From Swiss-Prot:
Membrane topology: Single-pass type I membrane protein
Cytoplasmic membrane side: 588-953
GO cellular component term of the entry, any: plasmodesma
Residues at the active site: 750 (proton acceptor)
Gene Ontology terms for molecular function: ATP binding; protein serine kinase activity; protein serine/threonine kinase activity
Annotated protein name in UniProt: Probable LRR receptor-like serine/threonine-protein kinase At1g53420
InterPro entries, alphabetized: Kinase-like_dom_sf, Leu-rich_rpt, LRR_dom_sf, LRR_Rcpt-Like_S/T_Kinase, Malectin_dom, Prot_kinase_dom, Ser-Thr/Tyr_kinase_cat_dom, Ser/Thr_kinase_AS
Highest classification ranks of the organism: Eukaryota, Viridiplantae, Streptophyta, Embryophyta, Tracheophyta
């Protein structure tokens, strides 16, 4: 079916074109040609213009929609002015691509309703012609490189409701013509270079619900006119330069959920009436000059969300209701009168509590692996900084503390507490252990050293940008800025890690000389509202640091009267002797002799991972002792080991009889070395030496999900419902990364419960990429070698070798059912009688009782709504038609509750119904009737045991 059969209504994240004809549904040739030019300009050349039935819906002779997903498509062209050849165009959504150039002014003649261009490389001004688009309701240009003044003509938009211009380089004042935008509900200009004050005319925007003016360049004070915006739910103003001013009048704004007035030079007391706005979910008044006591009315906020009064001049006592709230309340940098032995000191971050701190001893150095485990780097021990994310105040055993203020807030007012991030870029570092994880903060991150010897020091702050990637896609477009304070003095304004280091994944070390006079050192990193907040995803911003090293800057004096020249001579002679000794030893052991072709091939890969010697691996595994053998991987046995620095590792050893062979081993190394995600097993390095082919992974403490759910009784873990849901979401995130976010588009091909490992905190990590296949160019191809596990394999792959990422989606659906059910997918009643969990799901669908699938071991201790959602998603994922399965990014959104499960698609999800499957379903009914009695008896015994145990206590 050709392109000329269809009409288009909008060109968007989904390109939608809707048109109504009385008797025909043919696209005029002129518009068809225009559409082809559009795709060429966007450099989107791989769209099949023959319409897939999954993408078009029609009624009789009237074609209603055609959709083409162009969001996150890594488009690298420019914006096509040829869209004017599609006169019925209503929507443009090219968000999160890599498009460059300017915005075509020609678009001003189109009847557009929505323009979404978030997250690209667009430059130049906003076309003044946009003021002619009277139909426009939404203009989203956030996270680009647009510049110039805001056009006066934008004030002529009578229907505009959403104008998001944050994270650009706009300058000048907000035009007075904007006073006419009385339909606005959402206005954002954060992270720009605007000038002037916040205009009084905003009082006319009486329908406004969201107003974001963070680090915009505008100066204070906050105008009195803001009191008229009674519909406000989300007000964020921060880093507002200008004179001191009293707290703005917000008494009549009673729907407020998020209020951020951070670093706005506010003075005076905290207003009593704020305590009467019970809709608050997030209240941040930090880094102002507010004084006085906390009003009694604020007790009404005790069951609310988050309160940050950091960095003011508040005094008096801390109310009892604010004690023991953990990271949800921060009162640091104030003047409260507190007994150092009071619980407030431990739970509310009141700095006065450190005045009477007793040092265990004095130190002449400080080394911290921020966000990571303890490790040794060139003989120097970097202390662990991996405390619980729910704590905002951490006390080490060696005289240093850290304070992490804030939670990340998205558009939905949903706060998220994240304090550690793992690497998702390609690291180009030597001491990679210091940079694979980092400490992050949403507002302010402070380290205090209280027990240093007095003297001169060099404070070295180690940074590497690990949350953006360096590829030519939207994930490389993020910009992180924060300020660096040393001893409460601003040393660096708007520090940008990637820019300083010349790229993401590179290391930059900032050194600051400091004289310590009272044994105390303070390092503070502060987010001043600058930078993107939605790239590569929402809530990515704020300070990030990998490590801290503080060393004395004074060289030790020569002893015993030895001159400096003599000392240097001895050092040179000793160094030469050591070099010859090491060279001879290595030659004797064969390390410097000619290497095999395999080793040469490995060296040519130039991978960004560690290369281990065979001797290191043998020592770590006790010469591959069978006692350290922990399993069988895709290549051969897997051993547990311990490196010299104490790091526990898992070593995958290629068996000599492996069918996959050396070539695929090297391919796996090349592939895995480019992948970094919290839900993928981390590759530390490899060894290609002496005929041995070894991969060195992080050791994952709790083995596989399969063993935890339905392995031998002694290996099973009691996984409660929140943990199961967390595991399911983690696996989905890992697959979404493989399919859509990594530089290489990868299909795993063997997703199953045994290939999902659980770490100490029961976070899931996808393992065994030995069967993975790169999905580089074609979205669909025929696999020359079927690889996977029956029962988890998608039907189109198992029967026809038809491989796409939707095969992994199918396998994920099976794993999700296992997580809910707590039993293996494959059930063998006899040698010739095998059936699968998906058959039982169909039985329960017929009975309209899907919740019967939930693991009976959970009893009633699970969230019914979440369980139903997970089952429904699994059903959609296991549809027999690949095009009916959702993408993994859609699965993540549905699991996290950010997107509703579409009932229509759920009903459309088809399942094979061959005679054999119907027989299996009948067998399933009988089987579950039988085990139902066993489970009932078992649960009764468990409940009885619990009752007896409770009675004993």
């Amino acid at each position: 079916m050709s392109l000329n059969r269809f009409l288009f209504t909008s060109f968007s994240f989904f390109l939608f074109f809707i048109v109504h004809f009385a008797s025909s549904a043919t696209l005029p040739t002129q518009e068809g040609e225009a559409f082809k030019v559009v795709l060429t300009t966007l450099k989107k050349t791989n769209i099949d213009l023959n319409v897939d039935p999954c993408e078009v819906s029609s009624t009789g002779n009237e074609w209603s929609t055609i959709s083409r997903n162009l969001k996150r498509e890594n488009l690298q062209g420019s914006l096509p002015k040829e869209l004017v050849g599609l006169p019925l165009l209503q929507e443009i959504d090219l968000s999160r691509n890599y498009l460059n150039g300017s915005i075509p002014p020609e678009w001003g003649v189109l009847p557009l309703v929505n323009i979404w261009l978030l997250g690209n490389r667009l430059t130049g001004p906003i076309p003044k012609e946009f003021g002619n688009i009277t139909t426009l309701t939404s203009l989203v240009l956030e996270a680009n490189q647009l510049s110039g003044e805001l056009p006066l003509e934008l004030g002529n938009l009578p229907n505009i409701q959403q104008m998001i211009l944050s994270s650009n380089n706009f300058n000048g004042e907000i035009p007075s013509t904007f006073a006419k935008l009385t339909t606005l509900r959402d206005f954002r200009v954060s992270d720009n270079q605007l000038s002037g004050t916040i205009p009084d005319f905003i009082q006319k925007w009486t329908k406004l619900e969201r107003l974001f003016i963070q680090a915009s360049g505008l100066v204070g004070p906050i105008p009195i006119a803001i009191a008229s915006l009674v519909e406000l739910k989300d007000l964020r103003i921060s880093d507002l330069n200008g004179p001191e001013s009293p707290f703005p009048q917000l008494r009549n704004i009673k729907k407020m959920e998020t209020l951020i007035l951070r670093n706005c030079n506010l003075t005076g007391d905290l207003p009593d009436y704020l305590g009467k706005i019970t809709s608050f979910k997030f209240l941040d008044l930090s880094f102002n000059k507010l004084s006085g006591a906390i009003p009694n009315t604020y007790i009404n906020l005790r069951d609310g969300g988050y309160i940050y009064f950091t960095g003011n001049m508040l005094n008096g006592s801390v109310p009892d209701w604010m004690v023991n709230k953990g990271y949800k309340i921060d009162l640091s940098y104030n003047n409260f009168s507190v007994d150092p032995t009071n619980a407030v000191c431990k739970y509310n971050n009141v700095l006065s509590c450190m005045r009477n701190y007793q040092c265990p001893k004095t130190f002449n150095a400080l080394h911290i692996n921020c966000g990571g485990d303890e490790m040794s780097i060139n003989g120097t021990i970097y202390e662990s900084d991996k405390y619980d994310r729910l704590e905002s105040w951490y006390e080490s055993r060696n005289g240093w503390f850290s304070n992490n203020v804030g939670v990340f807030v998205d558009d939905k007012h949903v706060p998220e507490r994240v304090t550690i991030e793992s690497n998702s870029s390609e690291l180009n570092v030597v001491d990679f252990g210091l940079y694979t994880q980092a400490r992050i903060s949403a507002i302010s991150l402070t380290y205090y050293a209280l027990c240093l010897e007095n003297g001169n020091y060099n404070v070295n702050l180690h940074f590497a940008e690990i949350m953006f990637n360096g590829n030519n896609n939207y994930q490389s477009l993020g910009r992180r800025f924060f300020d660096i304070y040393i001893q409460r003095k601003l040393e660096v304004k708007d520090f940008n890690i990637a820019k300083e280091a010349k790229d993401v994944g590179n290391v930059v070390i900032k050194t600051f000389p400091v004289e310590i006079k009272d044994g105390k050192l303070e390092i503070r990193l502060y987010w001043a509202g600058r930078g993107t907040t939605v790239i590569p995803k929402e809530r990515v911003y704020g300070p990030l640091i990998s490590a801290i090293s503080v060393d004395s800057s004074v060289n030790p004096s020569p002893r015993n009267g030895m001159s400096t020249g003599t000392l240097h001579t001895l050092v040179v002679i000793l160094s030469i002797f050591i070099v010859f000794l090491v060279f001879g030893t290595l030659w004797k052991k064969g390390y410097l002799r000619s290497k095999s072709q395999m080793e040469k091939d490995f060296k040519s890969l130039e991978l960004m991972i560690a290369s281990f010697s065979l001797r290191q691996i043998k020592i770590a595994t006790n010469n591959f002792d069978s006692a350290n053998r922990i399993g069988e991987g895709g290549f051969g046995p897997v051993y547990k080991g311990k490196l010299f620095d104490g790091t526990i590792i898992a070593v995958k050893q290629l068996s000599t009889g492996s069918k996959q062979g050396n070539r695929e081993f090297l391919n796996e190394i090349g592939m895995i070395s480019a992948l970094h995600h919290p839900n993928l097993v981390k590759l530390y390095g490899c060894c290609v030496e002496g005929g041995q082919l070894l991969l060195v992974y992080e050791f994952v403490e709790n083995n596989s999900l399969a063993r935890a759910l339905f392995g031998p009784q002694e290996t099973q873990l009691r996984l409660d419902w929140p943990t199961r849901r967390k595991i399911c979401i983690g696996v989905a995130r890992g697959l979404a990364y493989l399919h859509e976010e990594s530089r290489l588009k990868i299909v795993h091909r063997d997703i199953k419960a045994t290939n999902v490992l659980l770490d100490k905190q029961l976070n899931p990590k996808i393992s065994d990429f030995g069967l993975a296949k790169l999905d580089e160019e074609d979205s669909t191809h025929i696999s020359t070698r079927i690889a996977g596990t029956f029962g988890y394999m998608a039907p189109e792959y198992a029967m026809r070798g038809h491989l796409t990422d939707k095969a992994d989606v199918y396998s994920f659906g099976i794993v999700a059912l296992e997580i809910v059910h707590g039993r293996s997918n494959k059930i063998e009643r006899s040698k010739n009688n095998t059936f699968y969990l998906i058959d039982w799901v169909e039985v329960l669908r017929e009975k309209n009782n899907l919740l019967e699938l939930v693991d009976p071991r959970l009893g009633s201790e699970y969230n019914r709504e979440e369980a139903m959602t997970m089952i429904q998603i699994a059903i959609m994922c296991t549809s027999s038609e690949p095009c009916e399965r959702p993408s993994m990014s859609e699965v993540v959104k549905m699991l996290e509750g950010k997107k509703m499960v579409e009932v229509e698609k759920l009903e459309e999800a088809s399942v094979h119904r061959e005679t054999k499957r119907l027989e299996n379903m009948n067998t399933m009914k009988k089987y579950y009737e039988m085990i139902g009695q066993e489970i009932s008896t078992s649960m009764s015994m468990i409940m009885s045991d619990r009752s007896e145990s409770s009675a004993d206590h």
